[in-house]
């Protein structure tokens, strides 16, 4: 099921004062938007107490230099992320500021994972990965999610497994193998490592990641849970799996865990 390229009719109302899920912007305005959402995504992860060991990253493809992407500068805690704290990563891994001047650094694995994933997925704007309390333990089972909860239905028809022992991604080739495993799905469970999500917007990738973590928790706590039928899961997926749902999850997370979104500006 393609959740990046399309959207089914949503049964949910819009959010007052928020641009529509499918809003069209100029490239310059889109760059501003993606960077802001990326910084807020890191804030959401920080509020979840993720990334406190420097593990994890959220990328945002630049809409002007489309083979470049934004990551949080090395050494900045997720909970302190700002738009100005993001740096631009060139295809060869060189880190520059918005004017192209060398600056900062990024998590090495961040480049090795996100560069090949975004290169392999021109439909994806963002990818998200960090080590979490439930996603990492579940990944050690080397098994996909089953339809044992409502949220699981967002992924059961749109997930993949990276069955490899390369838990420390020290090479670009390692990232290419992850990209190949991800394929065109929105979730890849990385063996003994954790979760990786991709989306057609930063909001979508972050929303999917947080939901996938909740699904992983259910799987760890109810490993023998009885799954609903594929037919029933498909009915639920019709509204839970579209890209607009990942975006909507982000809106709720922003309202729930970030007291003042302007803090990233």
Residue ranges of predicted features:
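A conserved C-terminal secondary-structure "cap"
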Residues: 4-41, 184-265
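An anion-binding catalytic pocket shared by soluble metabolic enzymes
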Residues: 21, 28, 35-128, 135-146, ...
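Short hydrophobic-aromatic micro-motifs
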Residues: 60, 69-72, 161-163, 189-190, ...
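Divalent metal-coordination and catalytic microenvironments
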Residues: 60, 117, 131, 178, ...
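Short acidic/polar capping segments at secondary-structure boundaries
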Residues: 76, 132-135, 142-143, 166-168, ...
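A general structural signal for well-ordered alpha-helical packing
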Residues: 114, 135, 175-179, 209
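Class I SAM-dependent methyltransferase SAM-binding "motif I" and its flanking Rossmann-like core
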Residues: 133-174
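A contiguous binding-surface segment within folded domains or other stable secondary-structure elements
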Residues: 160-196
